[in-house]
């Protein structure tokens, strides 16, 4: 089950460029059956390999990569400002929290796809109703190639009328929201299919 509750309820900087150490990158090894709830297995990629895959990204996407794994202030206002800056590029916004078990299972899928498609698609996180220390610990264990906006009061969650986390919002290159997926992605193929259907140029 994913975490749900009523709608009315209310830096760790691991930048990609210049990191010499190997960072743990959890890759989703999915079960054969669609919708499997099994947690993904883990492996590692070096920072150099991540940088190689993301090298040459357009400036707005490269700016995201430079803020990899950071938790930024701003909540909904910060997210809206970033989406405006990303106009011209499709975007995927993942709403997560450290206290959310399904988010922990889904994050490796987000991480892998954000590396595979990070030169064409923008990825942004929203850390909802979380404890900062818990959130940074979460990201230390499952580092991602993009920043998350801290949203302690659940502004984005409430504005989107979501019913649980994780949830993922899709935007086309014009900045129009095209789809909302409520619930986790446990399989890479499912996330990629939705990106191609709802967000990709």
Show the residue positions of the predicted features.
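N-terminal targeting signals for export/organelle localization
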Residues: 1-73, 201
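Thiol/disulfide oxidoreductase modules built on the thioredoxin-like
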Residues: 11, 137-145, 150-201
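Active-site acidic short loop of glycosyltransferases
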Residues: 87-89, 119, 162
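Short pre-active-site segment immediately N-terminal to redox-active cysteine/selenocysteine motifs
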Residues: 89-91, 96-99, 164
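Conserved redox-active cysteine motifs that mediate thiol-disulfide chemistry
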Residues: 95-112
């Amino acid at each position: 089950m994913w975490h749900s509750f009523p709608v009315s309820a209310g830096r760790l900087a691991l930048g990609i460029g210049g990191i010499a150490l190997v960072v743990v990158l959890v890759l989703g090894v999915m079960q054969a059956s669609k919708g499997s709830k099994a947690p993904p297995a883990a492996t590692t990629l070096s920072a150099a390999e991540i940088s190689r895959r993301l090298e040459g990204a357009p400036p707005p996407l490269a700016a995201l990569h430079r803020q990899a794994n950071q938790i930024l202030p701003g909540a909904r206002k910060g997210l809206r400002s970033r989406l405006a800056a990303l106009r011209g590029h499709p975007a995927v916004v993942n709403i997560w929290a450290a206290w959310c078990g399904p988010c922990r299972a889904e994050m490796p899928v987000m991480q892998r796809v954000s590396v595979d498609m990070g030169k064409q698609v923008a990825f942004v996180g929203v850390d909802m109703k979380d404890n900062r220390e818990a959130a940074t610990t979460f990201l230390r264990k499952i580092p991602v190639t993009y920043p998350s906006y801290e949203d302690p009061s659940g502004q984005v969650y409430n504005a989107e009328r979501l019913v649980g986390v994780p949830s993922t919002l899709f935007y086309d290159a014009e900045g129009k929201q095209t789809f909302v997926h409520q619930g986790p992605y446990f399989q890479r193929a499912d996330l990629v299919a939705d990106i191609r259907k709802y967000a990709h140029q």
